[in-house]
């Protein structure tokens, strides 16, 4: 299980593993959490100069499950209910963004891959719970940190960050539901004015991210 943050080259690491095991005549199952990542991984392989169309088969949204291609790129949702026999030909399994897999589904897939001697999990982060770490290490093996975000910043691969957390204090109030409390916060005039003024006072370009678009 390789823990490596954003912009650390996870796609290139995965590509290198795939090319290595394809050259060794192995059949590879590459599992990702979303449909968009299936296409992104396929495109990354093409961008690295590989003839992905000749070597890779994509599975998602009801696509054909069976293929003779040496590499299958799929979402975990597309395969976790398949019979054990479907998994028998795979010698290598690679899980990208492994922290986003549901534990039961991941275990279901990995236990069916009893012929997969080589198992690699990639993630930028763990969710902070020891149980989740144990589940991932149980199916992929021991975890190793490839690098850290601060190291990438020192090396100039990532932008230098200055993170400041601002906490706005409100008078204590009681709400019947969680949604009532959220509604109070996002419609609070002074709070929104503070965010507005802060945004306008900052130099350069500013990106403001928020949830509940309609409410704002």
Which residues make up each language-model segment?
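Conserved pre-motif I regulatory segment
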Residues: 1-3
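Conserved Walker A/P-loop ATP-binding site and its immediately adjacent core
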Residues: 8-47, 212-216
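Conserved interdomain hinge at the start of the Helicase C-terminal
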Residues: 18, 174-214
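Loop/turn-to-beta-strand initiation segments
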Residues: 27, 68-71, 90-92, 116-120, ...
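Conserved helix/coil segment N-terminal to the catalytic DExD/H
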Residues: 61-92, 103-108
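Post-DEXD/H (motif II) to motif III coupling segment of the RecA-like Helicase ATP-binding lobe
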Residues: 99-162
């Amino acid at each position: 299980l390789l823990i490596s943050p954003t912009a650390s080259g996870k796609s290139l690491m995965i590509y290198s593993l795939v090319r290595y095991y394809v050259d060794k005549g192995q059949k590879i199952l590459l599992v990702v959490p979303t449909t968009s990542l299936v296409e992104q991984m396929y495109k990354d392989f093409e961008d690295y100069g590989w003839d992905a169309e000749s070597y890779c088969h994509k599975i998602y949204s009801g696509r054909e499950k069976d293929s003779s291609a040496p590499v299958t790129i799929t979402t975990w949702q597309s395969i976790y209910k398949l019979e054990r026999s479907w998994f028998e030909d795979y010698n290598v399994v690679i899980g990208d963004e492994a922290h986003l897999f549901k534990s039961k589904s991941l275990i279901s897939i990995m236990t069916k891959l009893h012929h997969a001697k080589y198992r690699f999990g990639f993630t930028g982060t763990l969710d902070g719970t020891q149980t989740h770490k144990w589940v991932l290490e149980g199916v992929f093996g021991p975890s190793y940190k490839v690098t850290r975000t601060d190291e990438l910043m020192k090396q100039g691969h990532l932008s230098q960050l200055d993170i400041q957390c601002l906490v706005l204090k409100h008078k204590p109030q009681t709400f019947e539901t969680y949604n009532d409390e959220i509604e109070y916060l996002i419609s609070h005039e002074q709070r929104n004015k503070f965010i507005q003024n802060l945004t306008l006072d900052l130099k350069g370009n500013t990106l403001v991210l928020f949830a509940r678009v309609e409410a704002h």
